[in-house]
């Protein structure tokens, strides 16, 4: 996880403007650099580095002798960079995975380049020879990117919105900052005065499409057809490959472990592959919760079963509530379920950074959206409607779960890796017949559970453990995080405030006291930026008024009441 930042055509003092880049210093605690672009006194790059690959030569912007006119600032991991280097016989100057972007661009242009990348990324590529600027982001938006572009051609780009909101520009006192769309790249012309003009925004990949880079993958051949045993075999192959390719790092690997299906599968497969790779350390797994919470108990079972070096982080309701302000500042959103679920992830990331040497952290993010794991999928009117909803959730990941996962870990200088959002694994899963992917026998993610039933990766009670929302599983049924928050906000927001909510917050008006409380905090940090969240995350088909799984009639808990 790194932080990237760039300005083109600034009409204010760059030394003053660069101060805004320090607001994302948490993303790269190992080193930082600011560099002016040759020949353009009002253009510069900023970079905060978390050294994960090639600690000696990995500073950015990346420039190599062969292409002196190319400047690259990127945040991400390109898992197939070595395969592409060997395939096209590129001569590398560094061991940095991102260098492949320069070679591919020189060989085939921006579209072929971005379609060949197997990984997660957000980048700014400058070509001074052809006077072009390119912005790009991975399919699911696992790595964040924000931009501000004024009518007169001032462009500002950053990993997080907080690095842009305080920038000054003569013609636009209030810069419109917006997220760069996942699965897209943008082409901009660079003018002699350093300003830019947008040429085109291109959608280069959809989650259901098999990626172009698949033809160069080293994964073993998949079997054709949709017979259940064939599908299960292919899913195991692709999942194991998704884990394996993400072992690329020079830093210690750890894994978040809630004791739910997704994180448990990741942890078990990860530990197995680390042993095969003969890494010189034990896998550290991390669980958080209040004492005797369902997640802590389940995670302990998994850790004992797989033999990881397990860490349990206990927190109380007061610590959780006190963290809300810094959590919302880090997230840059006021979405209710995102904030709720982020508290535990924020606190455990803080623990990992302070108490361990694990830096690259695996997690199970993306599985619920991909495999129809949310409880409300039981209410889907048809397999086809469930399929549509799954694709919608994946398309909006960058606003919700992926945002949460990135900001809570990056806030503490950690890098998150999410194998369930692997291009090959996800596109194959989405290609399966809709009826194979829906809940079965009252159990969500039935196909995924069935796939690993005979693998001995996990205890049966974990493999078939019902869905538990992370924000609820870290507490208990009797005193859930949901209930704790409702009791707290009842004393912070009164009925009079709620009656005037639509006047105070006309856009995305909060409908609950909890939502009002979060919105107040957000507006304090980011006044006038409510449109960063287009809509609240809510379950479908059930007329819910709150996103908590605790409020659903289908909810089942493995905890003792």
Curated annotation (Swiss-Prot):
Domain Asparagine synthetase as annotated: residue spans: 213-536
Phosphoserine carried by residues: 557
Class of enzymatic activity (EC top level): ligase
Signal peptide annotation: none
Active site: 2
Pathway given in the UniProt record: Amino-acid biosynthesis; L-asparagine biosynthesis; L-asparagine from L-aspartate (L-Gln route): step 1/1
Keywords: Acetylation, Amino-acid biosynthesis, Asparagine biosynthesis, ATP-binding, Glutamine amidotransferase, Ligase, Nucleotide-binding, Phosphoprotein
Keyword DNA-binding recorded: no
Glutamine amidotransferase type-2 domain boundaries: 2-191
Annotated site, Important for beta-aspartyl-AMP intermediate formation, chain positions: 365
GO terms for cellular component: cytosol
GO molecular function, one term: ATP binding
Cited InterPro entries: Asn_synth_AEB, Asn_synthase, Asn_Synthetase, AsnB_N, GATase_2_dom, Ntn_hydrolases_N, Rossmann-like_a/b/a_fold
Transmembrane segments: none
Name under which the protein is recorded: Asparagine synthetase [glutamine-hydrolyzing]
Organism expressing this protein natively: Rattus norvegicus (Rat)
Gene: Asns
């Amino acid at each position: 996880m790194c932080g990237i930042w760039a300005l083109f055509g600034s009409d204010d003092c760059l030394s003053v403007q660069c101060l805004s880049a320090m607001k994302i210093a948490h993303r790269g605690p190992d080193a930082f650099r600011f560099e002016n672009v040759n020949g353009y006194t009002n253009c510069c790059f900023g970079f905060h580095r978390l050294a994960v690959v090639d600690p000696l030569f990995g500073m950015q912007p990346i420039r190599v002798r062969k292409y002196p006119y190319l400047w690259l600032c990127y945040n991400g991991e390109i898992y197939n960079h070595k395969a592409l280097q060997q395939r096209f016989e590129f001569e590398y100057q560094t061991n940095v995975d991102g260098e492949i972007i320069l070679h591919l661009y020189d060989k085939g242009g921006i579209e072929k380049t971005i379609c060949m990348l197997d990984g997660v990324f957000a980048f700014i590529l400058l070509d001074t020879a052809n006077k072009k600027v390119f912005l790009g982001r991975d399919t699911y938006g696992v790595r964040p990117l924000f931009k501000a572009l004024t009518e007169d051609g001032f462009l500002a780009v950053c990993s997080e919105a907080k690095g842009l909101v305080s920038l000054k520009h003569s013609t636009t006192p209030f810069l419109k900052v917006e997220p760069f769309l996942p699965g897209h790249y943008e082409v901009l012309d660079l003018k002699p005065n350093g300003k830019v003009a947008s040429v085109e925004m291109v959608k280069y990949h959809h989650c259901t499409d098999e990626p172009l880079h698949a033809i160069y993958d080293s994964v073993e051949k998949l079997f054709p057809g949709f017979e259940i045993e064939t599908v299960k075999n292919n899913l195991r192959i692709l999942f194991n490959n998704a884990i394996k390719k993400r072992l690329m790092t020079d830093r210690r690997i750890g894994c978040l472990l809630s004791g739910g299906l997704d994180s448990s599968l990741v942890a078990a497969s990860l530990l197995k592959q680390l042993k095969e790779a003969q890494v010189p350390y034990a896998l550290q797994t991390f669980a958080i919760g209040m004492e005797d919470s369902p997640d802590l108990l389940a995670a302990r079972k998994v850790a004992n079963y797989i033999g990881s070096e397990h860490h349990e982080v206990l927190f109380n309701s007061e610590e959780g509530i006190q963290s809300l302000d810094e959590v919302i500042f880090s997230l840059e959103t006021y979405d209710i379920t995102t904030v709720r679920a982020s508290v535990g992830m924020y606190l455990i990331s803080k623990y990992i950074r302070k108490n361990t040497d694990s830096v690259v952290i695996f997690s199970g993010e993306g599985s619920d959206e991909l495999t129809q794991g949310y409880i409300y999928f039981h209410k889907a009117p048809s397999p086809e409607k469930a399929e549509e909803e799954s694709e919608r959730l994946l398309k909006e990941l960058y606003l919700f779960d992926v945002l949460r996962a990135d900001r809570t870990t990056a806030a503490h200088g950690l890098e998150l890796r999410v194998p369930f959002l692997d291009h090959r694994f996800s596109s194959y899963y989405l290609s399966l017949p809709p009826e194979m992917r829906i809940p079965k026998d009252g159990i969500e993610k039935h196909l995924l559970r069935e796939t690993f039933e005979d693998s001995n990766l996990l205890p049966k009670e974990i493999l078939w453990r019902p869905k538990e929302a992370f924000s609820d599983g870290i507490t208990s049924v009797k005193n859930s995080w949901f209930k704790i928050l409702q009791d707290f906000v009842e004393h912070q927001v009164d009925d009079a405030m709620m009656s005037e909510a639509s006047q105070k917050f006309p856009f995305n008006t909060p409908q609950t006291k909890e939502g009002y409380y979060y919105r107040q905090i957000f507006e304090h940090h980011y006044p006038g930026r409510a449109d960063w969240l287009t809509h609240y995350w809510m379950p479908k088909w059930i007329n819910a008024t709150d996103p908590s799984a605790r409020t659903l009639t289908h909810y089942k808990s493995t905890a003792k009441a």
